[in-house]
Amino acid sequence: MPALQEEHVVQLLRPLMRTRTVLEPVQNPPEAHTRERRGPHAAPPPQPAQPAATWECATTRFGGFPTAEEGETWPLCDGCADDLAFVAQVDHSRDGLHDRLPISFFTFFYCWNCHPWGRDSERGAWLVRSYTALRRPKVLVHGTEPDFEERHAVPRLEKSLPDAVGLHLHCRELWDLVPGDSGSPEAWANWHVVDRAALGLTQERARAPHMRNAAVAIGGYPYWANGGDETPVCTECTLPMELLLQIRPSELTDAMWGDVGTLYLFMCRIHTQQTGLRIQCT
């Protein structure tokens, strides 16, 4: 098989470039994000349209109690009828520094009894509630204490390209040139060329091979922890969904999926009520 030329790889990768927002843990909920925190490519933060007290209850957080619209109740699992556990919420309009999906806020709940992994039959064992705007938000308290300790994050903007297995979906031409389904020494040498080209485009710090897009993040491309690309397609338009939230093992959350598992939430950009869930473990 021919050796890949880095210049050609750059030409194939450049049109795939996206941005993503990495969520970094902080001790206390941030009151505001400076332009330096947001990164050199970010626009100034929008001013909240709601009072400060409303904004504080809707801040991005993992654990604690969720924010909900007035009248909403705590969700139940369709499988076991037990309460879903609140995992995270994201103030997408404020903390999403990337090319965001057209929602302003979302919450994520999960059933630890049924432990869904993304099969269609498990759809009622997890829930994403998304909002184009929060009109009458409130903190939805349930029980005496939350499922997980409340933790907070600040956003950081990064560039994002598909990882190695993601090229099978997003750039089949490059996948076939490597070729991606070969474990030969020549293919591994070609993967190193792809890695160098990707690092040059994203300016991401070098990690172990094929570890692009690691971290807890919203937007961009997923880092597939152990397996092929499992991006779900929208059942209405049949287009691949986009990454909404990726949760890797992190001090941001005590939630764990399997053996050092990574959870991925997806959403269709056109049909935002269409969402998907995947989990991969190392």
Which residue ranges define each predicted feature?
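Preference for intrinsically disordered or flexible, low-complexity segments
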Residues: 1-282
